[in-house]
Amino acid sequence: MVYVFDIDDTICIRDNKNDLTYLSAYPIPERIEKINQLYDEGHTIYFLTARGMGRSNNKNPENLRGTTEQQLFEWGVKYHELFMGKPAADYYIDDKGISDKDFFN
């Protein structure tokens, strides 16, 4: 199976939403553990993030790629590919969507 995960407020917490560097984000270990288990079972893991798309007016999501990749590495996240540039939105409606709370509980 292929899984696509968001990053912020899904596998990490950002208490300071005004921190556009995302350096204040910290991991949610039990969620990362579940993702790593899926990876180890042979599933494909993608991350799709809106970092750099919202408050920065959709200017340069790629500017945050290095920071994001470093965080995923430091947090021990196993994945196949990181996609930057997810459009910022209040809601995402998808026929295959599931809330993070439902998935991780």
Regions picked out by a protein language model, each given a short descriptive name:
Residues 1-105:
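Catalytic phosphate/metal-binding cores of nucleic-acid and nucleotide-processing enzymes, i.e., regions
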